């Protein structure tokens, strides 16, 4: 039997089954068995850990069997619905026949099963139980700290000791909790003795007595070298000679008392070997604050340089709740780096090592997402359990002894612990370092290549911002010389020897092939993908160039590109590739040659965090982990993108610092649009029989043709003009170190939700302040960075002040009640927008729009299917249930959900929930097929494809584990596709991994293709007011990609819609209308493009990107009207003054823009007349000559 400790052969059996969350009590159970069997012959004691059941079905089967034949059942720490439901029928049946059922420290559904003598918790409360309820209510009023709860737990049995009757069974229940929470071998033994002697049907055993629970310190210190392992005096702890720093470690009291401490011992040993003095503290009740107060502060202030939590939980809370506000206040008081390391409870170390995704859905949420809300960084796996097969995740090849495997003892992951120790040491030393000696590596980006994109980032004026940051660093005491102007800074980084070596930036260093070969531990992995060192990227054949410029102790470098741009074969591969030699060498050079103490990734976003590897819970074989190593990594990130920021935190150890997005403004009207509106205003004011009305109609017709609005009636024309005029656009790019002007503040405040005058003044004050540089300086100095939720400024002013550490929403609470309501309304708008009820909708889901809307698009998908989320007793997401057809009032729509890789990583619980909703709908046997399109299609797929209903009901698709994007955008961006169906090939190759109820992917391109044949509508929500479908390439990569795949599957276009919820309400537009609106409100609007061009080269790059993205929509959907290309050509290329201006600012982007417009013509996306085409070609040739330095100036 799993985890069972048996009695002597031939003795009558008596069985006790303990069903709990984890296996920390397995060791004590094994050790106490011989002593128990001396007094209780035939007794068997088994420990069953619910955390093991998902990955080990045999463990669940053993638990059910043990419950079925147990004489006493103890169930505790069961808080997760999946665990509860797995054994609830067996527990309910056992309750009616066992000698005693003890449910404690668990979900109410488990606690209510308690039946101990006269104590039956399913009966109405009376007597002592009524008193208990009053006491529990009083404890909530007095606070919910672990210390106060434990005090009450010790007090109540003393109060009940002399109360006769049922009170003695209630006392037994409290004593059972005391024994369990005091979880040593002795206390577990005495708990068993106590329960058996009191409740066993064997009367002879009633004479045996149990000792009272041994009380251990609730708060204390642990060290394996101490005589008793536990002390309350820090002076008892050993301290390494010449210790460089002191680090506070937070540990779980339960593991220490159970003597399951091999993982803690390994951490302590590794830290001390590196010269780190440790304060290994523990506290009871899953609240770390008492330990912090007792040992990490003294009269002089903070006594530690960094804090590492080894608990796997949030600082204040556990598996049931999380008090982030209390945690943040405690951590602000310490003001040291806070690192969250976690032991694995839901899988073995070997399973984790082999898992492409790394952590499972519950692990990702509990171990990573919730600590992030406290401000934790650098999430690191450090321990877990072994089965007999051991772990092959690193060359160490760790295995457990048979005894350790049987006891399911925690084992350290030595490779990860070494990394944890080095990361912690570097962060602690960073905090202690002298500013004048601190060396900082600033990382800029240059993607896509050959596009004038070097030194650009989303929403950010990079060089203006960097100039301000460098000057602030100099004032702070950093040793560096800053160029005299922004342009001088730009020239120093991007100029210098760049042209001499044919590179996009100055050559700062050259790393020889010999050095690459001798110094790259994973050389074979890189050479397998890219050939022998030094490769062809950023190389002269003898070595690799390091691009950038050094300014004293600050190096500003350019991150190399992915390397696969323009290579269709690589882009069609379903997974990622190892980084190039140049990419690997860049980070190694920063770490070893430049000697950086900290990196600063400047803006959103680079390629590091998108390199292949696990989604969460990095191992030493994951490329982000290999590349960044133990270097502290500060990341300047847009406040409106918590999803990609979270990816950077989890995969590259980023400590994020938020910056605002550009200020917003109304688009207004310009040139012909304003003239047309003036004419329409006069027209609408005239009486129907006014004589001038006919003449004005002719003028309106001419004006409408001039702005390509002549295909609609006058009323529609008027509405489109108002829509364009009222559209929100960004005013240029954001500059770090430059607060909004008073006019910009007023404009943005006017767009925000209604607020009190006090709140309005507070928001205005925060917008006037410069907090981002201050935040960067704090992060570069190794301070605690206060967490802040991400979002859009006008919808969530809570993102202020910026300069803090961004995090996502609590995944357990998503979707919220408001999001459920809003998602249902948006689903109905989509159905109303389509001429007839669609049978199948292809819905694109991103992480960012869901996190910022608390799950609105997720709720929309559920609403279309006729489902709703299910939450457990604690308000945590537990799954999905179907809405009855009678309540739904329409058929269930089949929804093909394609998730971004980031959604898959950040929202694994929601991924499983969506899959469960589709599965339940597909298996709703009593529903007419005409009212359930999901079931109708699934039955058809099952029959045609010869698969079971589990497979036929799969509707959630995404990338392979550790892979991101469809690469449709890269194919378009590099003009690396021939026929448009090659884009469908890429999409299906990358996005054909089906995610079912288990959350694990299975590649099934055949099912995706079959599903796409029935799609009537493709749809995606517009994520943010700062974005449009033409401003970033991700929209046509996802929505465009699936639309192209649908066209190929069904042989005709599906309708494509955009849901614009950027202003709080909801508007559904056709994609064609959305592109036209954005072209008028943004691309062709002087207010918009002049705002970009004031930032020079970076603004030109943004304009070029919009032209390329427009081409992407034509390639994928054919939904771009020809006039769009005509007007873009006239505005930016055929106008000589504008052309020369753009070429002077950014020659590469200008050439690329002209080439894009010619490519659109060549691909027949528009047909310019011969004169226009010749002029466009001539202009392109002129720009090309200028770029090559041939044209006369």
Curated annotation (Swiss-Prot):
The GO terms this record gives for MF are: ATP binding; magnesium chelatase activity
Lineage top rank: taxon: Bacteria
Q: Which reaction does it catalyse?
A: protoporphyrin IX + Mg(2+) + ATP + H2O = Mg-protoporphyrin IX + ADP + phosphate + 3 H(+)
Q: Name the CDD domains on file.
A: CobN_like
The pathway is:
Porphyrin-containing compound metabolism; bacteriochlorophyll biosynthesis (light-independent)
Q: Which UniProt keywords apply?
A: ATP-binding, Bacteriochlorophyll biosynthesis, Chlorophyll biosynthesis, Ligase, Nucleotide-binding, Photosynthesis
Name a single GO biological process. light-independent bacteriochlorophyll biosynthetic process
The catalytic activity of this protein is classed by the Enzyme Commission as 6.6.1.1
Top-level enzyme category: ligase
In UniProt terms, what function does this protein have?
A: Involved in bacteriochlorophyll pigment biosynthesis; introduces a magnesium ion into protoporphyrin IX to yield Mg-protoroporphyrin IX.
Similarity remark:
Belongs to the Mg-chelatase subunit H family.
Protein name in the entry: Magnesium-chelatase subunit H
């Amino acid at each position: 039997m799993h985890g069972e400790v048996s009695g002597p052969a031939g003795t009558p059996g008596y069985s006790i089954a303990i069903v709990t969350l984890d296996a920390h009590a397995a060791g004590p159970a094994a050790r106490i068995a011989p002593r128990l069997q001396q007094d209780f012959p035939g007794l068997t004691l088994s420990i069953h850990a619910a955390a093991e059941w998902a990955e080990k079905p045999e463990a669940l089967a053993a638990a059910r069997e043990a419950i079925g034949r147990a004489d006493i059942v103890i169930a505790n720490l069961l808080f997760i619905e999946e665990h509860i439901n797995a054994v609830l029928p067996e527990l309910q049946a056992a309750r009616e026949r066992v000698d005693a059922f003890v449910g404690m420290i668990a979900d109410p559904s488990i606690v209510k099963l308690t039946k101990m003598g006269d104590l039956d918790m399913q009966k109405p409360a009376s007597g002592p139980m009524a008193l208990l309820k009053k006491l529990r209510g009083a404890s909530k009023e007095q606070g919910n700290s672990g210390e106060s709860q434990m005090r009450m737990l010790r007090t109540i049995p003393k109060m009940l000791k002399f109360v006769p009757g049922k009170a003695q069974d209630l006392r037994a229940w409290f004593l059972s909790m005391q024994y369990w929470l005091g979880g040593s071998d002795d206390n577990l033994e005495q708990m068993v003795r106590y329960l058996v002697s009191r409740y066993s049907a064997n009367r002879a055993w009633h004479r045996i007595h149990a000792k009272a629970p041994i009380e251990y310190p609730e708060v204390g210190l642990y060290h394996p070298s101490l005589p008793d392992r536990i002390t309350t005096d820090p002076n008892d702890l050993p301290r390494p000679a010449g210790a460089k720093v002191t680090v506070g470690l937070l540990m779980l009291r339960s593991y220490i008392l159970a003597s399951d401490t091999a993982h803690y011992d390994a951490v302590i040993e590794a830290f001390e070997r590196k010269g780190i003095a440790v304060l290994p503290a523990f506290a009871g009740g899953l609240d770390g604050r008492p330990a912090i107060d007792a040992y990490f502060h003294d009269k002089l202030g903070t006594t530690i340089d960094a804090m590492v939590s080894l608990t796997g939980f949030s600082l204040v809370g556990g598996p049931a709740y999380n008090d982030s506000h209390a945690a943040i206040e405690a951590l602000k008081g310490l003001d040291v780096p806070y690192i969250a390391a976690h032991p694995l409870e839901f899988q073995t170390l070997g399973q984790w090592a082999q898992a492409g995704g790394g952590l499972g859905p519950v692990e990702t949420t509990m171990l990573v997402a919730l600590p992030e809300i406290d401000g934790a960084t650098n999430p690191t796996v450090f321990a877990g359990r072994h089965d007999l097969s051991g772990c092959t995740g690193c060359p160490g090849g760790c295995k457990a002894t048979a005894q350790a495997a049987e006891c399911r003892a925690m084992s350290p992951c030595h490779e990860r612990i070494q990394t944890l120790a080095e990361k912690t040491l570097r962060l602690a030393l960073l905090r202690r370092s002298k500013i004048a000696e601190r060396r900082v590596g600033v990382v800029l980006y240059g993607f896509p290549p050959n596009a004038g994109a070097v030194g650009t980032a989303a929403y950010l004026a990079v060089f203006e911002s960097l100039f301000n940051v460098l000057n602030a660093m100099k004032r702070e005491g950093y040793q560096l010389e800053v160029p005299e102007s922004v342009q001088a800074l730009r020239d120093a980084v991007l100029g210098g020897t760049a042209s001499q070596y044919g590179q996009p930036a100055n050559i700062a260093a050259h790393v020889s092939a010999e050095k690459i070969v001798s110094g790259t531990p994973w050389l074979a992995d890189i050479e397998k993908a890219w050939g022998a060192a030094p490769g062809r990227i950023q190389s002269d054949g003898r070595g690799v160039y390091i691009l950038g410029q050094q300014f004293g102790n600050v190096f500003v470098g350019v991150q190399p590109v992915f390397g696969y741009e323009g290579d269709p074969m690589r882009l069609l591969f379903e997974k990622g590739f190892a980084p190039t030699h140049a990419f690997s060498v860049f980070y190694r050079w920063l770490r070893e040659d430049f000697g950086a103490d900290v990196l600063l990734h400047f803006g959103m976003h680079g390629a590091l965090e998108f390199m292949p590897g696990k989604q969460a819970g990095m191992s030493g074989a994951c490329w982000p982990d290999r590349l960044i190593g133990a270097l502290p990594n500060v990341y300047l990130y847009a406040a409106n993108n918590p999803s990609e920021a979270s990816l950077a935190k989890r995969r590259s150890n980023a400590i994020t610092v938020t910056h605002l997005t550009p200020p917003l403004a109304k688009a207004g009207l310009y040139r012909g649009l304003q003239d047309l509106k003036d004419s329409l205003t006069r027209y609408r004011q005239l009486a129907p029989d006014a004589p001038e009305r006919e003449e004005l109609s002719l003028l309106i017709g001419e004006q409408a043709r001039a702005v390509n609005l002549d295909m609609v009636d006058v009323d529609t024309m008027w509405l489109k003009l108002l829509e364009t005029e009222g559209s929100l656009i960004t005013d240029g790019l954001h500059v770090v170190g430059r607060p909004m002007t008073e006019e910009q503040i007023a404009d943005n405040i006017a767009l925000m939700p209604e607020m009190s005058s006090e709140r309005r003044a507070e928001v205005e004050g925060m917008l006037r302040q410069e907090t981002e540089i201050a935040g960067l300086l704090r992060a570069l100095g190794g301070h605690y960075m206060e967490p802040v939720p991400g979002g859009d400024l006008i919808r969530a002013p809570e993102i202020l002040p910026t300069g803090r550490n961004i995090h996502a929403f609590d995944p357990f609470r998503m979707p919220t009640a408001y999001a459920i309501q809003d998602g249902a309304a948006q689903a109905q708008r989509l159905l109303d927008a389509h001429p007839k009820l669609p049978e199948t909708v292809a819905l694109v889901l991103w992480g960012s729009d869901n996190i910022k809307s608390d799950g609105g698009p997720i709720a929309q998908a559920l609403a279309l299917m006729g489902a709703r989320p299910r939450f457990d007793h604690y308000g945590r997401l537990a799954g999905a249930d179907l809405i009855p057809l009678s309540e739904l009032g329409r058929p269930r729509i089949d929804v093909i959900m394609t998730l971004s890789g980031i959604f898959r990583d950040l929202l694994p619980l929601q991924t499983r929930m969506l899959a469960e909703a589709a599965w339940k709908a597909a298996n709703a046997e009593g529903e007419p097929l005409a009212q359930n399109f999901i079931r109708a299609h699934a039955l058809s797929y099952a029959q045609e494809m010869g698969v079971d209903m589990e497979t036929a009901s799969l509707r959630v698709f995404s990338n392979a584990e550790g892979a991101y994007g469809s690469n449709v955008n890269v194919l378009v961006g590099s003009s690396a596709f021939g026929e448009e169906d090659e884009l469908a090939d890429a999409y299906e190759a990358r996005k054909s991994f089906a995610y079912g109820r288990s959350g694990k992917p299975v590649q099934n391109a055949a099912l995706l293709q079959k599903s796409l044949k029935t799609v009537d509508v493709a749809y995606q929500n517009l994520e943010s007011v700062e974005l449009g479908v033409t401003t970033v390439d991700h929209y046509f990569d996802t929505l465009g990609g699936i639309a192209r795949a649908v066209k190929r599957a069904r042989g005709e276009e599906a309708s494509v819609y955009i849901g614009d919820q950027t202003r709080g309400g909801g508007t559904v537009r056709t994609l064609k209308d959305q592109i036209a609106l954005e072209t008028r409100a943004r691309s062709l609007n002087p207010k918009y493009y002049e705002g970009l061009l004031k930032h020079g080269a970076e603004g030109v790059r943004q304009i070029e990107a919009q032209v390329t993205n427009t081409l992407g929509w034509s390639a994928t959907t054919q939904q771009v009207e020809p006039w769009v290309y005509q007007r873009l050509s006239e505005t930016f290329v055929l106008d000589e003054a504008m052309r020369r201006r753009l070429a002077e600012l950014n020659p590469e982007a200008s050439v690329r823009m002209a080439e894009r417009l010619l490519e659109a013509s060549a691909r027949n996306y528009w047909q310019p007349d011969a004169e226009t085409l010749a002029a466009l070609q001539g202009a392109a040739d002129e720009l090309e000559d200028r770029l090559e330095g041939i044209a006369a100036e």
